[in-house]
């Protein structure tokens, strides 16, 4: 995961804890923001934007719109397996790996889960027991909607690996 430390508001550098708001698409997260469904302090998890789920990571613009909501910008966290632009700011955690589609921790976050972020100590914690985490991971299944895409994209999704290992096509 990557956090642009210089862009994080000072009050969010340590001791952040928020309730997860979970979105499986960028559009769903933007709709929630625009319709006032994000509350101060929420941890906005926007997943399935990584290499496997979106063929090369989706440009993530949620935090840019969050800037227009001062109270939210200074109290919320944004966590995604997608990528940020160089101009991103706020408590934004991107490129989370392994991505949700590969069974990474973002895939098992549930609405209302508590998430802690300590930027200084480089720690992100999903506040559930080890047993609950193991259970959720063992039950997690992600299915790529193959019928909606051309054959070469289906091959890419079937074979691409994690960003942490360079997104190598495993043949």
Sequence positions of predicted segments:
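Feature captures the catalytic cores and cofactor-binding loops of soluble hydro-lyases/lyases
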Residues: 1-171
């Amino acid at each position: 995961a990557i956090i642009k430390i210089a862009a994080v508001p000072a009050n969010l550098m340590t001791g952040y804890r928020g309730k997860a708001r979970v979105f499986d698409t960028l559009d769903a997260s933007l709709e929630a923001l625009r319709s006032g469904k994000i509350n101060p302090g929420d941890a906005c998890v926007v997943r399935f934007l990584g290499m496997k789920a979106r063929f090369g990571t989706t440009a993530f613009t949620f935090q840019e719109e969050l800037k227009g909501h001062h109270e939210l910008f200074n109290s919320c966290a944004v966590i995604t397996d997608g990528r940020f632009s160089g101009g991103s700011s706020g408590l934004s955690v991107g490129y989370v790996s392994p991505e949700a589609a590969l069974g990474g921790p973002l895939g098992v976050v549930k609405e209302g889960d508590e998430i802690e972020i300590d930027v200084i100590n480089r720690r992100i914690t999903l506040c559930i027991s080890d047993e609950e985490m193991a259970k959720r991971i063992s039950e997690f299944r992600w299915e790529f909607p193959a019928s909606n895409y051309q054959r070469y994209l289906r091959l890419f999704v079937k074979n691409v690996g994690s960003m942490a290992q360079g997104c190598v096509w495993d043949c």
